[in-house]
Amino acid sequence: AKFFRLSIPQIKFREDLGIKHGKHMLWDNDKKIGSNYFIARLQEAGIECYEKVNGERQPRQTHRSHIKMKDIIFPIVKFESPEFQQVHQWLNGQVITETKGVFDGLNVVYGGFRFDFGTGGLHGCISSGYVDSDDDCIILDADVGSYYPSIDIQYRLFPAHLSEKFCDIYEDVKNQRFSYAKGTPENAMLKLALNAAGFGDTNNEFSPFFDPKMTMAVTVNG
């Protein structure tokens, strides 16, 4: 009974969407809801996401034998400190064949803080402990709304097999999302669509959004 009560918001979310779009979504996970919506938008625009291979329906994809880092690091990315300039130069000379665990151990200590680099982006964390604000210092928690989707749109990133039309549809979905109030089923569904198509499923080998070069362009620059 407790599990059911906790599940009510998710059940209602799927029921409301199902009624509006005329589909049964009760058993779909969040990512599938988002992916299916974006796939429908692409196919409405004449962009095929699937093809027949030996009589079986298969997702269209772009596979990469290797990815040159210099091809995905944006020209706008520049550093002033020698420590970061050295890493930037080194990364531009790398060619990767995998998308995970490639740059383990690559880091820079700057200003007493350690920055770790990887194919998932730039990360850093202070040592565990208690932090409190005072008269001289405040704790600032900053977030960027739709950060990865904004990178996709600003730099026109798209899975190679889906053409640049992907970018226009993607931007329209983002604008559409913000036309709905936060907390509405529509807003939630469009957020799922943006996250799946513009990032999460670009490295999913079972998805029609699969193109690891796009994944790396988003995470390394973002």
Where are these regions (language model features)?
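Conserved "right-hand" nucleotidyltransferase catalytic core of DNA-directed polymerases
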Residues: 1-145
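Helical catalytic core of nucleic-acid polymerases
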Residues: 94-222
